[in-house]
């Protein structure tokens, strides 16, 4: 009964909120079939992955970098992944006129494909790359079609738009600015282990005074920073909210 009441309370909070911010992690995409790269059996379990995905490796060996980049993220098959119920739910909130911004740690671009327009890609995106000289952008299909993608104008090897090891987070300040404006922070599908993003719930709860909601299958160790905790898959959480209408 308490569980049902929590769903109803969160539904009403979202209904009344002026500004909603959503932080998403791997759990938002695993329901689309995308592997959790940071899981025990994920791609990041390979000790060499951090080197292959580093800024230094790209600078030293850009051709080899692209070979490993494509293998690690399996970009040749990436078109098969589609937005799931969680992605659509967030897009629907926006369509209803809600001021909602998504801060995502995911690099798959599925929030945008699912219809969300206000997305801050904290770790960049697999969907695009750009020329390091003239800044011309190229899409995923171009990367798939070229073994080592080069700029058609400059012939420079493209720079991926994923944030690499050794890079700063270019969108970090924009994300924090949004946190300080928000009424509600929903954290979905992340273990909150990677800094500086792991500090976002504490900022929202302790400094901003926002209502905070956690949706994650596993406990994070940060439950004290949340007003509501749902130990569910995101699809289950969305279904629980929908059934309260």
Curated annotation (Swiss-Prot):
It is an enzyme of class 2 (transferase). The active site is at 123 (proton acceptor). It is found in: Cytoplasm. One of its GO terms (cellular component) is cytoplasm. Keywords: Cytoplasm, Metal-binding, NAD, Transferase, Zinc. The keyword NAD applies. Pfam families: SIR2 (PF02146). Zn(2+) binds at residues 131, 134, 151, 154. Binds 1 zinc ion per subunit. CDD domains: SIR2_Af2. SUPFAM superfamilies: DHS-like NAD/FAD-binding domain (SSF52467). Gene3D superfamilies: SIR2/SIRT2 'Small Domain, TPP-binding domain. It catalyses: N(6)-acetyl-L-lysyl-[protein] + NAD(+) + H2O = 2''-O-acetyl-ADP-D-ribose + nicotinamide + L-lysyl-[protein]. Nicotinamide binds at residues 37, 107-108. GO terms for molecular function: histone deacetylase activity, NAD-dependent; NAD+ binding; zinc ion binding. Its EC number is 2.3.1.286. Residues 1-245 form the Deacetylase sirtuin-type domain. The keyword Transmembrane does not apply. NAD(+) binds at residues 26, 30, 37-38, 105, 107-108, 123, 190-191, 216, 234. Its cofactor is Zn(2+). NAD-dependent protein deacetylase which modulates the activities of several enzymes which are inactive in their acetylated form. HAMAP family: Sirtuin_ClassU (MF_01968). Belongs to the sirtuin family. Class U subfamily. This is NAD-dependent protein deacetylase.
């Amino acid at each position: 009964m308490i569980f049902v009441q929590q769903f109803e309370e969160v539904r009403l909070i979202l209904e009344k909120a002026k500004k909603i911010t959503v932080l998403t992690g791997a759990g938002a995409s695993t329901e689309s079939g995308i592997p959790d790269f940071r899981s025990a059996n994920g791609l990041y379990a390979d000790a060499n992955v951090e080197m292959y995905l580093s800024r230094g490796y790209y600078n030293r060996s850009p051709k080899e970098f692209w070979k490993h980049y494509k293998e690690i993220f399996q970009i040749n098959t990436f078109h098969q992944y589609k937005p799931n119920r969680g992605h659509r739910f967030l897009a629907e909130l926006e369509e209803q006129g809600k001021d909602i911004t998504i801060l995502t740690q995911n690099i798959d671009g599925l929030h945008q494909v699912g219809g969300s327009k206000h997305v801050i890609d904290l770790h960049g995106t697999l969907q695009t790359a750009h020329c390091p000289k003239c800044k011309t952008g190229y899409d995923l299909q171009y990367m798939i079609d070229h073994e080592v993608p080069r700029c058609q104008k400059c012939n420079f090897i493209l720079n991926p738009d994923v944030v690499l090891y050794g890079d700063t987070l270019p969108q970090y300040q924009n994300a924090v600015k949004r946190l300080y404006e928000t009424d509600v922070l929903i954290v979905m599908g992340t273990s909150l282990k990677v800094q500086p993003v792991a500090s976002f719930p504490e900022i929202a709860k302790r400094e901003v005074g926002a209502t905070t909601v956690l949706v994650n299958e596993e406990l994070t160790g940060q439950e004290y920073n949340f007003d509501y905790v749902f130990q569910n898959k995101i699809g289950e959480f969305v279904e629980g909210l929908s059934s309260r209408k």
